[in-house]
């Protein structure tokens, strides 16, 4: 009986202890949930009350909570401080604690890997890339049983290597990710990894590897049956790569079917409902880009195509649409990719403005690019060479040849991109040709490096055609007219094959000029009239000015007084428009940008008293 009584007493004590423990746990849970609720209320207030949110989360620690709650609270604090404050030191401390504690807790993957992901982001922001890499590698190593996080961390480390310009390591990681996705049965995420790898291979110009990869991607995308928005977004990614591949190669005509498919694809996406995607396979929980970002991207590649083809009014129309969409998006979204899209759009429309005779507007837009680059060192690093190239083109348009040379030389120093290098050298050579005998040795060296008959450095059809044009221009200025005609006919053949309208117009008018000098007025007229028509269609103000002057002189020589008078009137109108624009551009304070050749973009510009450049070339 005594034993039974003792057992009963023990059982009662145990039950009492268990009840006390349960009550304590319930109380702990209630205070924790209360603090968490307050913190979330303050975080989501309008405007957010971040200081109060942080106080509520910090109040968790004096209660000596269990490890799970402690680790999660450190993660929440680190996340709030990282995203909403500039206190990176405290954010780092909390995230490091979350990562350390969570590794000791079994089945705590979400907290563990989110802490690793955020912490590596913070390290990169602080330029501690060497701390971010091993952290991500360890997280990747221990996340193989968690498909979503394993894929996400692989993408993150690949992106880090890409930002460091280590594309080989990035491609290797994306290859690992593609194979892992295949093993866990996620064809969708496998396609994302492969398309990302294809994008990097295009950047590296490894075209022999790109073609089979894109073919495989095309098959995977077409065969995958899943959420319609995810499927269409894969198709957009695939088609964007194809279109940019064609445009990089200067194949403006060949790209049209792909571009049309891309435009139809984005129209399809815009009609689909944004239902929340909840795939059964956790490895499928990825999305390439938001729908709105994809729309801007399709506008962007359409602008690139229109610019290369010489449909400048169309380029203007799509740029306006894209910039309007970007302004709306940037009110709600601070994603860095939006600023990149904006800069690339502005770079293209600036070139359009310079061709259409709107130099003052182009200069103000160059200044806008400078301001965007001032806000982001990475953006400036990626676009500095393009910015100096645009300034060089502006300098040519206002006849500041010494400044043009300085800008192009600076751009060459800042780029290792082959296509951009060839574009800059082609334009620099044209500056030296116009300058006469001042730079003969340098000019000969440049022309040899972009010799389209022998070892042209890039595969771009458009740039090779432009190199033939520059050789023709040089031969014309040297008085070697037969040689000039051969080069220009080669340009015409290549530009006609791919609908490169600006090159066609420039080649026709220069051929017309050669025939005029040689006294072959009929053949000259046969070149100049279509050049004028094409230049009006683009519209290209410089070619129109040149063509109208030639038509005036041709008609005078042939005794066609009325036609000569009409052409003279056209020439006068074009001259006045260009002269007025020239004066306006050179009077802007931003015109001082032409002297900037070193360091980050200047913050302010001093206003000038008036233009200080020669107008002789316009009259």
Curated annotation (Swiss-Prot):
Region named Sufficient for interaction with NIPBL: 1-121
Pfam families per UniProt: Cohesin_load (PF10345)
Compartments in which it is found: Nucleus, Nucleoplasm; Chromosome; Nucleus
Gene3D superfamilies attached to this UniProt entry: Tetratricopeptide repeat domain (1.25.40.10)
One GO process term, biological-process aspect: chromosome segregation
Keyword set, alphabetical order: Cell cycle, Cell division, Chromosome, Chromosome partition, Mitosis, Nucleus, Repeat, TPR repeat
Tissue: Spermatocytes and oocytes (at protein level).
A GO CC annotation given for this chain: Scc2-Scc4 cohesin loading complex
Domain of life of the organism encoding this protein: Eukaryota
Ranges: TPR repeats: 113-146, 385-418, 465-498, 505-538
Subunit structure: Heterodimerizes with MAU2/SCC2 to form the cohesin loading complex. The NIPBL-MAU2 heterodimer interacts with the SMC1A-SMC3 heterodimer and with the cohesin complex composed of SMC1A, SMC3, RAD21 and STAG1.
Family affiliation: Belongs to the SCC4/mau-2 family.
Protein task: Plays an important role in the loading of the cohesin complex on to DNA. Forms a heterodim. eric complex (also known as cohesin loading complex) with NIPBL/SCC2 which mediates the loading of the cohesin complex onto chromatin Plays a role in sister chromatid cohesion and normal progression through prometaphase.
PANTHER family, A to Z: MAU2 CHROMATID COHESION FACTOR HOMOLOG
Protein name (record): MAU2 chromatid cohesion factor homolog
């Amino acid at each position: 009986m005594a034993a039974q009584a003792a057992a009963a007493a023990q059982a009662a004590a145990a039950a009492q202890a268990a009840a006390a423990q349960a009550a304590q746990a319930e109380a702990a849970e209630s205070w924790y949930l209360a603090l968490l609720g307050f913190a979330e209320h303050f975080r989501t207030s309008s405007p957010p009350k971040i200081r109060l949110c942080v106080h509520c989360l910090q109040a968790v620690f004096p209660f000596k909570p269990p490890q799970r709650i402690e680790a999660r609270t450190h993660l929440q604090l680190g996340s709030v401080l990282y995203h909403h404050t500039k206190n990176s030191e405290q954010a780092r401390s909390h995230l490091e604690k979350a990562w350390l504690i969570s590794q000791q807790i079994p089945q705590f993957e979400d907290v563990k890997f989110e802490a690793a992901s955020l912490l590596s982001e913070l390290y990169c922001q602080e330029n501690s890339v060497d701390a971010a890499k091993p952290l991500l590698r360890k997280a990747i190593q221990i996340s193989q049983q968690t498909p979503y996080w394993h894929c996400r961390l692989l993408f993150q480390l690949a992106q880090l290597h890409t930002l460091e310009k280590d594309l080989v390591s990035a491609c290797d990681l994306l290859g690992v990710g593609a194979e892992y996705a295949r093993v866990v049965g996620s064809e969708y995420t496998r396609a994302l990894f492969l398309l990302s790898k294809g994008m990097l291979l295009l950047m590296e110009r490894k075209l022999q590897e790109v073609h089979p990869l894109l073919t495989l991607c095309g098959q995977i995308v077409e065969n995958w049956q899943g959420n319609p928005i995810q499927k269409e977004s894969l198709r957009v990614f695939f088609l964007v790569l194809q279109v940019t591949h064609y445009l990089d190669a200067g194949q403006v005509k060949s790209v049209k079917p792909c571009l049309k498919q891309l435009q139809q694809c984005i129209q399809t996406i815009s009609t689909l409902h944004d239902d929340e995607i909840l795939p059964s396979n956790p490895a499928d929980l990825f999305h390439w880009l938001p729908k709105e970002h994809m729309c801007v991207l399709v506008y962007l590649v359409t602008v690139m195509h229109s610019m290369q083809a010489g449909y400048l009014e169309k380029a203007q129309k799509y740029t306006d649409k894209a910039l309007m969409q970007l302004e709306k998006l940037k009110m709600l979204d601070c994603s860095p990719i939006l600023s990149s899209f904006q800069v690339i759009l502005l770079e293209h429309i600036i070139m359009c403005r310079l061709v259409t005779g709107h130099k003052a507007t182009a200069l103000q837009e160059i200044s806008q690019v400078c301001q965007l680059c001032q806000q982001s060192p990475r953006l400036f690093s990626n676009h500095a060479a393009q910015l100096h190239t645009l300034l060089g083109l502006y300098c040519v348009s206002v006849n500041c040849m010494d400044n043009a040379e300085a800008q192009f030389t600076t751009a060459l120093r800042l780029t290792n991109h082959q296509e951009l290098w060839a574009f800059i050298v082609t334009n620099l050579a044209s500056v030296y040709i116009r300058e006469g005998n001042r730079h003969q040795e340098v000019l000969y060296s440049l022309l040899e490096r972009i010799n389209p008959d022998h070892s042209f450095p890039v595969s771009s059809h458009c740039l090779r055609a432009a190199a033939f044009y520059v050789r023709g221009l040089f031969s014309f200025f040297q008085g070697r007219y037969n040689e000039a005609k051969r080069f220009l006919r080669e340009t015409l053949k290549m530009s006609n094959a791919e609908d490169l309208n600006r090159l066609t117009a420039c080649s026709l008018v220069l051929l017309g000029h050669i025939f005029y000098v040689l006294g072959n007025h009929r053949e000259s007229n046969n070149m100049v009239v279509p050049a004028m028509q094409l230049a009006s269609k683009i519209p290209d103000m410089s070619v129109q000015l040149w063509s109208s002057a030639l038509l005036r002189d041709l008609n005078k020589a042939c005794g066609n007084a009325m036609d000569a008078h009409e052409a003279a009137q056209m020439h006068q109108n074009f001259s006045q428009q260009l002269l007025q624009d020239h004066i306006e551009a050179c009077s802007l304070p931003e015109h001082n940008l032409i002297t900037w050749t070193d360091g980050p973009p200047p913050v302010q510009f001093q206003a000038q008293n008036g233009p200080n450049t020669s107008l002789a070339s316009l009259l």
